[in-house]
Amino acid sequence: MGTYAVDMVYACHSMQVEKCRMLDLGAGGVKLNGATAQDPASERTHHVVIADNDIGFGGRVFLAGVGVASLRASHIDIVHNHIHDLYYSGVSCGWLWGYEESTSFDNTIAYNHIHCLGHGVLSDMGGIYTLSVQPGTVIHHNLVYDIEKANYGGWAIYPDEGSSHILIENNVCFGTSSSCFHQHYGRENIVRNNIWAFGREGIVAFTRPEEHIGFTFERNILLTKGEPVYTGKGIEKIKADMNLFWDVEKKPLSYAPDLFKPEENESMDQLKARGYDLFSVVADPKFADPEHGDFTLAPDSPAFDIGFVPIDLSTVGPRVGSAD
């Protein structure tokens, strides 16, 4: 396949791409495009289901091919796909930089198995990547791991420029070459009840603070190996509390405003003294085998004390009888 296996261009609606194998791809698997808010409404793309597909071994001609790219489209369900072995992002959703009116909204990205991306070839990517104001968009129950950047930017979930009003919950993300979660800039996103583990440059990053609150971060579990739990300027522009932190090497936990200036790092006690993560806890979450990707919680895990709800990923990826 020379470019994308499926390419929908403008005014596509009420369609399904299901139970397909899309492998050995010049670019990516599925691309949707639609009209902007300034274009005629009749040209908008909406109500498309992309489900139970195996999408992999892409970018063989165009390195920046994406597993599923939803550009300027609404009511798109990207669910139960296996997306793997690409040189760039697994899922991209949005595609309008900044806070202008967007035609990307009410999208669902859920139960996808996304892994082995980047391979050290490209930079600035995410297992799941978003752009623009997207009210009603939900990212939940995805398993994302092994994101390897070239020079910078290998994140699991990456709300980029203008990403706003997105709910990110019940995802398990680990083994990234940068942080597990990174918000460049956006407003009023909610990030709750996720597991973030073993980002080589930290766990949670935020890089462009603005006057408003960027995101609310609560009831997450953050697991690290000596790396900072938070990185970036502007921690005062996020609302973080009721989280659980743990360093498997039992090193002191820290917030790093600048990764290149470790002398500026703050301890968790210093953060609490400034009013952040006041009711968060530092404790071993008692995962079954996190080093090998098993994040099952023991019955007596202290994570339950912060209100964490176990994440059921038993149906992640294509369902029985489908492409996988």
Per-region residue spans from a language model:
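Extracellular, surface-exposed repeat architectures
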Residues: 63, 68, 75-77, 122, ...
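Structured core elements
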Residues: 7, 77, 92, 127-129, ...
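Short glycine/acidic-rich loop motifs that flank beta-strands on beta-rich extracellular proteins
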Residues: 1-6, 26-32, 59-66, 87-93, ...
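Right-handed parallel beta-helix
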Residues: 12-27, 40-59, 74-88, 101-118, ...
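Asp-box/WD-like beta-propeller blade repeats and closely related beta-sheet repeat scaffolds
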Residues: 33-40
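Divalent metal-dependent phosphoesterase catalytic cores across multiple superfamilies
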Residues: 3, 9-12, 70
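Acidic, glycine- and Ser/Thr-rich low-complexity intrinsically disordered tracts
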Residues: 210-324
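Active-site proximal loops enriched in glycine and acidic residues that flank catalytic Cys/His/Asp
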Residues: 10, 34, 72, 93-95, ...
